Every structure is written in C-alpha cells, then in structure tokens.
Amino acid sequence: MLSPFEQFLRRATAGGIVLIAATILTLILSNSTWHTAYHAFWEQHLSLRWGNWIFDQSLHHWINDGLMAVFFFVVGLELKREFLVGELSSLRDAALPVIAALGGMLAPALIYHQFNPTGPAADGWGIPMATDIAFAIGILVLLAWRIPRNLIIFLTALAIADDLGAVLVIAIFYTPALHIKALMIAALLLLALLLFNRSGVRHTLPYLLVGLPFWYFVILSGIHATVAGIFLAFTIPARGRILPDELADNLSAHGQHLRDTITHSKRLNPLVNGQLAGIIQDIRNLSVAALAPQQRLEHAIQPWVTFAVLPVFALANAGINFAHISVNMLFSSVTIGTCLGLVLGKFLGIGLSSWLAVRLKIARLPAGVRWRHLLGAAWLGGIGFTMSLFIGQLAFGDPRLREEAKLGILLASLIAASIGLLWLFQVSRKKGDVPA
C-alpha cells in the first residue's frame, strides 16, 4: 500500500501531465480558426436564481471564484496536514523550506518591481512569487530514480509554504474595498464552523451547508473567494470520531460476529441476508468514523481538483494568441519583469536564503541532499503557472497587461522547467549521488 506522500507524488505527477496537455490544447484553440468562439465561450453567463435573489457570473468568473475556491480548499487541507503531522510540523524540519519559500517570494517581487516601479503595471509584483506545485513536483519526479527522495520532500514543503504565502498576498494586497456587512455575516458563519469543530461534529454535511453561504458572503465582502476555501479547510476536524485502538476492539468483536453469522447461515449473499449486510455496514461505518473528516475530504476531492479543476482553469486562463505577440509585447516591462522574476528571482531567492539559513545554523540540508540538488530544485521553483496566472487575473484589469503577464509566465515556466530538468539530470550523474 502506498504511503500518503507517495500517493500525493503519484497524483502530482499525473496532474502535471494533464495540466501540460490542457495548456497545449488551450494554446492550439487560441491560435486556431476557433479562437473567437473559444474566448466567447468563457464569457457566457451562468445564473443562480431563487425568488428575487440572483447570482449571475460569467463562466470565467465561476471558474476563478468557484472552482478555484475548491482548489484552495484542498490547498488548505494540505497545509493543515503539513502543520499538524507533516514536514512543517516542527520548527527544525520546517525551517529550511519556509525560509526558502520566503526568499523565493521576496526576490521575484523585488526583480519585478525594478522593471515596473510605478503605474498600473506595478500592481503585478505578486505574479512571480508563486510556484506551481503540480508542474514542479511532476518534473522532479521524472528524475526520482536519480535524485535523493528528500529533495522531493523539500520542494513539496517549499511549494506548500509558498502557497500559503500566495494566499496571504491575495488576501492582503489584492482585496479591493471591503463591505463590512457581508464581512460580518461571513465572520459569523466562520464562527459557526469553528463551533462545529470544537463541539465534535464529524459529519461533513454541516460544514458544506454552512461553507457554501460562507463562500458567497466572502465574495460579497470584497475578499477573494479563494480565501474562503483556505479558512473553511482549517475548520475541518483533523481527528476521527473514534480512536484506532477503539476501532481495533470494535472490529475484533464485529469480525467474530461476522464469522459466527457466516458459519450458521446458508445465505451468504448480503443482498438476501439482512443480518450479514448489517454487520458489514457496521464495519464500514466504524472504519469511516476512525478516519478524520480532513482525510476523507482530501482523499475524495483532490483527484477532482487535479484532473478537472486545474485543467479547466488552464483552459479558461492560459490561452494566448501568438499572432498578437509583437516585439513590444515580448520586451515589455511586465513580460520581462514576470519572466526574470520567476526564473532568476526564484533561483536566487531560494538558493541564497537556503544558503544563509544553513550558514547561520538556523536550518540544515535534508539528509542526502547536496547543494547542487537544492539549486536544481530552486530552478524548478520558477515554474509559476497556475498560481501566477491566477494572481495575474487579480492584479490587472487591463487585458493588455494580462496578456503580457501571461506571456512572461509561460516563457518563465518553460525556461525554468528546462533548466531545472537538465541541471538535475547533469549533477545527478556525479558519483556518490545515490537517492536516499
């Protein structure tokens, strides 16, 4: 049976492949004879009505405000798991990836700011701060047999810490005017969710029933809906209703009951043997009760996010018409600032902050990981894609600036992935580099 981390790696790798395929399809559609219909499709409106109440959004907004809230909900579940029992659960283990993530966010923002110090373009400083976990881990796993396993764990923890930083940036710097009444209602709903957690509610339905209006009022408050996904995830209980030892005792008793029923019954089909079906259902309910709601939801939703939400997001946001790319667009301050911020900023920020943390004995390199491995991971940190595209949509209202940022993100992701892959392939050929 695969460990949770191995399951995560498998999903991330497959998800990266699907995301690449969706991006290629998007670029094909954007540069085909269907490009007008392609763009018009995402501007179609979808409305929800109930009496006099109406909630009307374009498909593009439903994806960015709705589906991406589900993505951030899963990110929140992953963050909570990492803080409780994962690589970020202890200061000693979390120090290096967290410091590396901070450096990897500050340096790209500073580089972008050097090219765009004033004007509307200056609002895009948050675009190169993000790392796409699916792409970066997917590339790294291609070399899993040549590199230390702890390098994959390091980059995963870094990307998760990076996601948290991106969420904070969105919440603090990309939130327009706040609507206090809606914010107060959202706060009351969040309080109700926290009370569910503290009072031992382990069924997921109450969290869903309160979580949906919470998401709606967060949107009305002016805060981006993705923040609602993170907060909702943090309220989901991380403990099951029964403990493992209690589960073992109950399973032992039910197992004996099941054996006795099988021995004394001629009908062994649960469809026609109600007693047998009842015992099996009790065993199933006990097993579910032992799993934390957080685990159940993450296991159930993450495949949908990996193979549906993110590819649909790419289809709606990654399209760029190459015929519209001019020399001015290619060398615009937004394109260059975004591209250099991701490629050089991530490499320098992650590399230098990690070196400084180890040098000052604040952190240590993971077992089996050498500096040349870590620098390879730093190059891969420049794959910004999903989160960078998302922040670009929030940062710019001007379609021209959005297109320039999109071009910079695509170029940077391609360059960073190529350099990182070649770098790690080359340095892993050195003797003594046996995966740990």
From Swiss-Prot:
InterPro entries: Na/H_antiporter_dom_sf, NhaA. This is Na(+)/H(+) antiporter NhaA. It catalyses: Na(+)(in) + 2 H(+)(out) = Na(+)(out) + 2 H(+)(in). The lineage of its organism: Bacteria, Pseudomonadati, Pseudomonadota, Acidithiobacillia, Acidithiobacillales. GO terms for cellular component: plasma membrane. It holds the Pfam family Na_H_antiport_1. NCBIfam families: NhaA. It is found in: Cell inner membrane. HAMAP family: NhaA (MF_01844).
